[in-house]
Amino acid sequence: MDKEQLTTVVEKMLNSIGFKTARVSFRGGCFDLVATRQILLLFIKTLVNIDKFTEEQAEDLKRLAKLFRASALLVGLRTKNIELEDGVVYERFGIYAVNPETLFSILAGTEYPLVMAERGGFFVRIDGERLRELREKYGYSTTELAEMLGVSRKSVQRYEKGEGMVSIDVAIRLEEIFDEPLVKPIDIFKAKIEKVTLSSPPENELEKEVFDRLERLGMSVVKIKRAPFNAVTKEEDEEVNLLTGIDEKKTPSTIRRVRLVNQIAEFVESEGVFVLNEKKTEVVGKVPIIPKDILNKVRDVDELMEIIKELRSST
């Protein structure tokens, strides 16, 4: 199965369980599918080999998840050495990765996996607070419990603090000792995005000019390197994001990017706009293409959004 076939499989699977999807074919992009069902919004990257996922793609994907209050996910078939196992969660640069079968099991039956693949084997997460309660209830010291498990006292202390993962053998032994489930399911829709930085420098002079202008108008600008748009911009305290594309001139590649942004904007309930170093104004789909000169002349964000609204309604 190649990447295109994998993306098709994932998209059809999502559609079969009630998701609306938008496919985003953009070379080197940080996501290939946008999917939504009720309040769940997913940005999904598909790769046959998840080891080809880059840190730059991961950072962009985490930025998008944070900006849109969405979930970021990697769906693949194998690493460079092994196939991804059913019911097992993998991780690349803070983004959870699963195979299509595992994703279907989660979304169709809300059965979250228990096992995480890390260096050295398979591990699970323990409910540390419950473990401490049970240890104290049964009257074991941390040293006594450590001896029963064949681990160090510091390891038991880490388990109780919820720090790190626990080997499957140790988890089984704990549940045998206390006769109670202690393994916590892994919520793959909660990627580690809390520490992602939203600041990233522009890549060229035109980007810098446009970003500086938008910031002077009072908008925040978050650079996205691996997407059809160059940045996500928004006015402070406003909910609507503006997917902002930038290019020197209109080319077939530009139009293709505009069409992708038009498709994405609908799913993430946002507006789209492209700023070009040209004189002509036009609209592709519902996305206006405006000259940089127009952007330079607007007085505030309200005027910019009014221009975008008027251009959209003119089609």
UniProtKB/Swiss-Prot annotation:
Residues 131-189 form the HTH cro/C1-type domain. GO terms for molecular function: DNA binding; DNA-binding transcription factor activity. It comes from the Archaea. The keyword Transcription applies. Keywords: DNA-binding, Transcription, Transcription regulation. Residues 142-161 bind DNA. PROSITE patterns: HTH_CROC1. Pfam families: HTH_3. InterPro entries: Arc_TR_HTH (IPR020886), Cro/C1-type_HTH (IPR001387), Lambda_DNA-bd_dom_sf (IPR010982). HAMAP family: HTH_type_cro_C1. This is Putative HTH-type transcriptional regulatory protein PF1851. It comes from Pyrococcus furiosus (strain ATCC 43587 / DSM 3638 / JCM 8422 / Vc1).
